[in-house]
Amino acid sequence: MPDMTMKSQPDRLYGRQRGHALRPRQQRLLDLTLPRLRYAGPSSLRGVSPLWLEIGFGGGEHAVAQIEAHPDVTLIACEVFENGLCSLLSRLLPEPLDEETAPLPGNLRVWDDDARPLLRDLPDQVLDRVFLMFPDPWPKARHAKRRFVHPENAATLARVMKPGAEWRIASDDPTYQAWVPEVMERQTAFELLAVSNERPEGWPPTRYEAKAIRAGRQPLYWRYVRR
């Protein structure tokens, strides 16, 4: 059972921010395209609604599917891993589209840093939906404080989510699957709507999900609502 008296989360990032060496086009996407989409702070959100947030978008499949399916919604997509950022940007601008001038979706903002400072800076009750899809599970007990599903982050999300807003979580890791309900049952600001071992309708698939299923791991999908 998780220790709810655990120490506060370290105010630093863990894990890699770069994998394999970037190819020339990937570097151009980071240098020329990313600045065009980068989230510019709370003042840039005036009049923006509905507003969704994805924490750790991985390869970007889910984020792109959501903005295409919901053009009336603005999505802030967070990812620190450079190769994941490049994957998202290349989905938006496949070759030979120009990295500096080709049109980009107007309902997407990208945050290429730790999501927690972004959350702390958001106004109260601004988010309509939050996605946490297959986060790093940090399965060792001594690393539990690094997991995003954590009492401190849940409290921050409770402040910035509107009443009735939904937090969607997915994980294929058994440790995380036990961790999520233990943490969330203690959060009075959230109510469990549903948990399923089948991906619900309206949840775009991701490569991480496909990889888990191929490896014989069964994902779980949670839907929590802000009371």
Swiss-Prot record:
Q: Name one Pfam family in it.
A: Methyltransf_4
Quote the PROSITE patterns the UniProt record gives.
SAM_MT_TRMB (PS51625)
Which intervals of the chain are annotated as region Disordered? 1-21
Which residues are catalytic?
A: D136
Q: Which residues bind S-adenosyl-L-methionine?
A: E54, E79, D114, D136
Q: What is its EC number?
A: 2.1.1.33
A single GO cellular-component term from the record reads: tRNA methyltransferase complex
If you read the UniProt record, what top EC class would you report for this enzyme, in one word?
A: transferase
Cited InterPro entries: SAM-dependent_MTases_sf, tRNA_(Gua-N-7)_MeTrfase_Trmb, tRNA_methyltr_TrmB_bact
This protein's pathway reads: tRNA modification; N(7)-methylguanine-tRNA biosynthesis
Any GO MF annotation of the entry: tRNA (guanine(46)-N7)-methyltransferase activity
Q: Does the record carry tRNA processing as a key word?
A: yes
Q: What residue ranges are annotated as transmembrane?
A: none
Coiled-coil blocks? none
Q: Does the keyword S-adenosyl-L-methionine apply?
A: yes
Keywords, sorted A to Z: Methyltransferase, S-adenosyl-L-methionine, Transferase, tRNA processing
UniProt: substrate binding residues: K140, D172, T206, R207, Y208, E209
- What Gene3D superfamilies does the record point to? Vaccinia Virus protein VP39 (3.40.50.150)
This enzyme catalyses:
guanosine(46) in tRNA + S-adenosyl-L-methionine = N(7)-methylguanosine(46) in tRNA + S-adenosyl-L-homocysteine
Outline what the protein does. Catalyzes the formation of N(7)-methylguanine at position 46 (m7G46) in tRNA.
The similarity annotation says: Belongs to the class I-like SAM-binding methyltransferase superfamily. TrmB family.
- What name is this protein filed under? tRNA (guanine-N(7)-)-methyltransferase
Q: Which gene encodes it?
A: trmB
